[in-house]
Amino acid sequence: MVHVLMREFTDSFKSVRSILIILFLTFIAYLSASFLEDNPGLLDAFMSAQEDGASIYTGAVSIIILILGFLFVFAISHDVINKEIETRTIRLLVNKIPRWQIVIGKALGILFFWMITILISYIILTMISGELYLAHYFKTILFLLYVISFVLFISSIIPKSKLTMFLGILLGISLPVLGLISVSSEKWYFLPFKYLLPYYYMEDESIKLLIPLIFSIIFLIISVVIMKRRDL
């Protein structure tokens, strides 16, 4: 499993997209924070929605991930499982390690990549601003764990990588919109999105934060079951 984890981690960092995402995150977060600092009214509204001691810079990174996280993860990892099956490289892995270790190893490799990516952005912004708020980091990683597990689940049930690429763009745009709208909406048809997507649970630091973790575990278990039953 460690081999799968390290390969997935290094492959993610080798991609030009990963470097662009780090630069994009840091640059947009800095611009957003600078804009809010220049507009005291907006800054007060932003900080009133944050916990005491929160950093405007790290908060900006978290907001960007909440909005674009699905799109980012799909862009890099939409074919994390089905590409291995299409190219038949999965056969080399299943001869050496159990299938569940392949799924978990890939999930952890992608998660570690995002942990390092977000940490790099946080370090750069902390050096600029002198502010750091670790609660933002851990909530962002928890959100990304949900997204990674969901993307891996989609890549497990859909055999064609080109289809997951198209679906990834569609879901990467639509799910954040539906999730964020459902948080403040009382309409009955938004309720499934409110409770199945992680946005509602990210509002505070209560026990609700465990629910995205539970969903992540469920997605991974289903992915493992699918892999075990699939003829490779």
List each language-model region with its residue ranges.
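Terminal transmembrane helical anchor/hairpin motif
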Residues: 35-56, 164, 169-232
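Hydrophobic alpha-helical transmembrane segments of polytopic membrane proteins
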Residues: 72, 136-163, 175, 214-222
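Aromatic-anchored segments of alpha-helical transmembrane domains
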Residues: 26-33, 114-124, 170-181
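Membrane-interfacial helix-loop-helix connectors in multipass membrane proteins
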Residues: 120-139, 143
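Helix-loop-helix units of permease transmembrane domains in multi-pass membrane transporters
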Residues: 76-109
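Aromatic- and glycine-rich beta-strand/loop motifs that create alpha-glucan
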Residues: 1-23, 160, 231-232
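Selective transmembrane-helix segments that form parts of the transport pathway or gating/packing helices
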Residues: 17, 98-125
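Long, hydrophobic alpha-helical segments
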Residues: 56-83
